[in-house]
């Protein structure tokens, strides 16, 4: 097995970090690796806000109370970004259409691909991290904190640092429940219940809810109002 695949299969989320900085040279490598991710038509429809000051991390923690943010050596906010595209379009026409859902898919996928590259690069250098999607629940406040202009929105953040904890790799769904030959196959409730048991066994005494219960908590409720409100304010919907 290649070193790259071994590293990818060993991934765990790290939420506790030592009080050590990430050297600028390593940050440059991580962020340059992020830039090399695939991108729709090479539009590179995302930006990254790098946060290293404790004051800014503390302010962010007040909005998104995840200890990993406060402890991180560096926090990367990945932003879906059509602001740059708007400026490019204006060189040729007065009409700019961010394209609603399609524009959101383009920017979100570009950001996600770059973010995964960044995390993998960080792990290859001995760092750890966790992707934090809860930033979207405070989209309006984050837009103000980070001075995000029109046609931009927070997609997720990554807290990075020197790991101060170790976990076993979290079991994923069986491959046959995710990869289908030739055509889609709907899942049975038995397959969901089986994975509930796998996840509960993995979590042990830490288990408070099952995997399917967490699905119900997420998708049994309306979308967060802040996300849509910010997208409308930033002229993306």
Tell what function each PLM region has.
Residues 1-237:
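Acidic, surface-exposed loops and disordered segments
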């Amino acid at each position: 097995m290649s070193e790259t695949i071994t590293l990818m299969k060993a991934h765990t989320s790290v939420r506790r970090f030592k009080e050590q900085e990430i050297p600028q040279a390593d940050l440059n490598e991580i962020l340059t690796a992020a830039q090399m991710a695939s991108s729709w038509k090479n539009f590179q429809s995302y930006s990254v806000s790098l946060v290293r000051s404790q004051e800014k991390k503390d302010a962010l923690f007040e909005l998104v109370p995840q200890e990993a943010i406060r402890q991180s050596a560096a926090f990367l906010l990945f932003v879906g970004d059509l602001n740059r595209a708007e400026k490019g379009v204006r060189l040729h026409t007065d009409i700019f259409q961010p394209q609603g859902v399609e524009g959101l898919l383009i920017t979100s996928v570009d950001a996600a691909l770059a973010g995964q590259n960044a995390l993998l690069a960080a792990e290859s250098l001995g760092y750890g991290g966790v992707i934090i999607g809860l930033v979207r629940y405070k989209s309006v406040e984050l837009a103000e904190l980070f001075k995000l202009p029109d046609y931009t929105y927070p997609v997720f953040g990554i807290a990075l640092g020197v790991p101060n904890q170790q976990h076993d790799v979290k079991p994923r769904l069986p491959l046959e429940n995710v990869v289908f030959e030739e055509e889609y196959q709907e899942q049975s409730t038995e397959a969901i219940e089986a994975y509930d048991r796998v996840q509960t066994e993995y979590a042990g005494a830490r288990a408070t809810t099952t995997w399917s219960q967490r699905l119900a908590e997420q998708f049994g409720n309306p979308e967060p109002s802040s996300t849509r409100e910010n997208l409308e304010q930033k002229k993306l919907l």
